[in-house]
Amino acid sequence: MIETAKVVVAVFILLGALICLIASFGVLRLPDVFTRAHAASKGSTLGVNMILLGVFFYLWFVTGELSAKILLGILFIFITSPIGGHLICRAAYNSGVKLDERSVQDDYNGIRNFVIKRKEDSYL
């Protein structure tokens, strides 16, 4: 039983490390801040949570203890990492950072123009 648990733990930790490695290549190779932030937030959300799940399963199966701290860490990263990536992209967009020329769609532009128009109308 313990050997099987160690294999499961190793798979989770190695898979998490592989996801983080792939995300780091994405951060280095992708063209603009928006796609880089996307790769970084996905890598941290999935990769780090897989590693923490591996640690949680190790503590549970091998040592027999359940760690609420690790579960809270998983929950914290699962919630805050996508929000942080979104806020970084939103701040970059609002400060005038341009999309890469290969980007085919700018979803935020229509909403931004609508909000600006609505603010102008409310001042009249």
Curated annotation (Swiss-Prot):
The keyword tRNA processing does not apply. It comes from the Bacteria. Its main location: membrane. GO terms for cellular component: plasma membrane. It is found in: Cell membrane. GO terms for molecular function: sodium:proton antiporter activity. InterPro entries: PhaG_MnhG_YufB (IPR005133). The chain crosses the membrane at residues 7-29, 44-63, 70-92. It is a multi-pass membrane protein. Forms a heterooligomeric complex that consists of seven subunits: MrpA, MrpB, MrpC, MrpD, MrpE, MrpF and MrpG. May enhance MrpA stability, assembly, or function. May play chaperone or assembly roles for MrpA and perhaps for other mrp proteins. Mrp complex is a Na(+)/H(+) antiporter that is considered to be the major Na(+) excretion system in B.subtilis. Has a major role in Na(+) resistance and a minor role in Na(+)- and K(+)-dependent pH homeostasis as compared to TetB. MrpA may be the actual Na(+)/H(+) antiporter, although the six other Mrp proteins are all required for Na(+)/H(+) antiport activity and Na(+) resistance. MrpA is required for initiation of sporulation when external Na(+) concentration increases. Also transports Li(+) but not K(+), Ca(2+) or Mg(2+). This is Na(+)/H(+) antiporter subunit G.
